Amino acid sequence: MIQVLLVIICLAVFPYQGSCIILESGNVNDYEIVYPKKLIVLPTGAMNSPHPCCDPVTCKPKKGEHCISGPCCRNCKFMNSGTICKRARGDDMNDYCTGITPDCPRNPYKD
């Protein structure tokens, strides 16, 4: 729902330009939240996006790319499964990328 509202707001503010809203998700107290990370505004049909992964017309990853941003996204591709995306602190355990999403899932074995 938040994503749709952001796109509507963006289109209302920039009705004659294509834009790319990069959303980053996080987890706060077991509730999934989505918040804007960066707004890229380009003329409609622009061939070059300032973000190498973002298609400015569709606001999605460019053809052949997996992701735009996130702790498990590097150079427009998902990081390998098992890559540490969040280091352990205190009694906490490391969190690892899955290789199929740009998000860093919480370790299910945490207390």
From Swiss-Prot:
Gene3D superfamilies tied to this protein: Disintegrin domain
- The residues covered by the Disintegrin domain are 47-111
What Pfam families does the record tag this protein with? Disintegrin
* Compartment annotation: Secreted
Short sequence motif named Cell attachment site, residue ranges: 89-91
Per UniProt, the keywords (alphabetical) are: Cell adhesion impairing toxin, Disulfide bond, Hemostasis impairing toxin, Platelet aggregation inhibiting toxin, Secreted, Signal, Toxin
Secreted as UniProt keyword: yes
Query: One cellular component GO annotation, for this chain's record?
Result: extracellular region
> Which residues form each disulfide bond in the chain?
C53-C76, C67-C73, C72-C97, C85-C104
The pro-peptide lies at: 21-47
Q: Where is the signal peptide, in residue numbers?
A: 1-20
Cite the InterPro entries for this sequence. Disintegrin_CS (IPR018358), Disintegrin_dom (IPR001762), Disintegrin_dom_sf (IPR036436)
Asked whether the UniProt record includes Protease among its keywords, one would answer no
Its main localization is: secreted
Report a single Gene Ontology molecular function.
Answer: toxin activity
Q: What does this protein do?
A: Inhibits ADP-induced platelet aggregation in human platelet-rich plasma (IC(50) is 8 uM).
Q: What does the subunit section of this Swiss-Prot or TrEMBL entry state?
A: Heterodimer; disulfide-linked.
PANTHER family per UniProt: ADAM A DISINTEGRIN AND METALLOPROTEASE DOMAIN, ADAM METALLOPROTEASE
State the similarity comment: Belongs to the disintegrin family. Dimeric disintegrin subfamily.
Q: What is this protein called?
A: Disintegrin DS-AN
Organism, per UniProt? Atheris nitschei (Great lakes bush viper)
